[in-house]
Curated annotation (Swiss-Prot):
One of its GO terms (molecular function) is structural constituent of ribosome. NCBIfam families: rplP_bact (TIGR01164). PANTHER family: 50S/60S RIBOSOMAL PROTEIN L16, LARGE RIBOSOMAL SUBUNIT PROTEIN UL16M. SUPFAM superfamilies: Ribosomal protein L16p/L10e. Part of the 50S ribosomal subunit. Residues 1-29 are annotated as: Disordered. It holds the Pfam family Ribosomal_L16. The lineage of its organism: Bacteria, Pseudomonadati, Bacteroidota, Flavobacteriia, Flavobacteriales. PROSITE patterns: RIBOSOMAL_L16_1 (PS00586), RIBOSOMAL_L16_2 (PS00701). CDD domains: Ribosomal_L16_L10e. Binds 23S rRNA and is also seen to make contacts with the A and possibly P site tRNAs. This is Large ribosomal subunit protein uL16. Keywords: Ribonucleoprotein, Ribosomal protein, RNA-binding, rRNA-binding, tRNA-binding.
Length: 141
């Protein structure tokens, strides 16, 4: 699973996910990608990202290259079951990536359009947000 090696603080506040993605909304490495088009921002866990990565690479049969453009750097905490409120914040349960609308999550290069489209469709099925397949501007079929 993806998670940071070190962090400045063990726990962080929840924060607000207002507006669209300010950066990472254009393809930078590959010719194809999937973009979040969910109406609100959301958290993607490291397990969801890993499941999507495995689904895409398995279909591509390790040809081409897959770039993961998001990283789960936000610790999500949870208190144990049947514990009363208060007495501090719970322990870190998992790591999540904050994904706002318009953010490119995965990019693929070095494979034909049909293979990339199907690989990213399988990856998108593993994610809890609405996605859109995008193609680079300088791509010629």
């Amino acid at each position: 699973m993806l998670q940071p090696k070190r962090t400045k603080y063990r726990k962080v506040q929840k924060g607000k996910m207002k507006g669209n993605s300010q950066r990472g909304h254009e393809l930078s490495n590959g010719m194809f990608g999937i973009k979040s088009v969910h109406e609100d921002g959301m958290f993607l866990t490291s397990r969801q990202i890993e499941a999507a990565r495995i689904a895409a690479t398995r279909f591509m049969k390790r040809e081409g290259q897959l770039w993961i453009k998001i990283f789960p750097d936000k610790p999500i905490t949870k208190k144990p079951l049947e514990v009363r409120m208060g007495k501090g914040k719970g322990a870190v349960e998992y790591w999540a990536a904050v994904v706002k609308p318009g953010r490119i999550m995965f990019e693929v290069g070095g494979v034909p359009l049909s293979v990339a489209k199907e690989a990213l469709r399988l990856a998108a099925q593993k994610l809890p947000c609405k996605t859109k397949f995008v193609v680079a501007r300088d791509f010629e079929a």
